[in-house]
Amino acid sequence: MSDNNGTPEPQVETTSVFRADLLKEMESSTGTAPASTGAENLPAGSALLVVKRGPNAGARFLLDQPTTTAGRHPESDIFLDDVTVSRRHAEFRINEGEFEVVDVGSLNGTYVNREPRNAQVMQTGDEIQIGKFRLVFLAGPAE
């Protein structure tokens, strides 16, 4: 209740972010993916992006559609809310069973394993940087 004459206060929307043990393992690993990443539980032909660094560290995004968009636009499949991210920054595409990240004309570019890339087929453990966000790619079992 509020003190403003019986009018209820507007509810504030909140988001909770839970950090996964995976992130800690990846930080301390010596370049190899941890033995158990949770990717083995993914549906066949899908993959997972885990935010390693950025305002929503620990968030996970399932890649199970032919094209998944990432950017600062509110209608992006992966909404990355920061000025370092373009409105329409990158797309994650499935091509013949392989996952590819494609920069779609962003201002700051898209990086895979700290190298600038316009397009790159991803492998499990690859780090994708979009603005100040760093995401780790984990592939599920092949179809």
From Swiss-Prot:
CDD domains: FHA_GarA_OdhI-like (cd22684). It comes from the Bacteria. The modification Phosphothreonine is found at T14. Residues 68-117 form the FHA domain. GO terms for cellular component: cytoplasm. It is found in: Cytoplasm. Changing T14A: Inhibition of growth on glutamine and glutamate degradation. Pfam families: FHA (PF00498). Keywords: Cytoplasm, Phosphoprotein. An essential component of the PknG signaling pathway. When unphosphorylated, it inhibits the activity of 2-oxoglutarate dehydrogenase. When phosphorylated it does not inhibit 2-oxoglutarate dehydrogenase. This is Oxoglutarate dehydrogenase inhibitor. The gene is odhI.
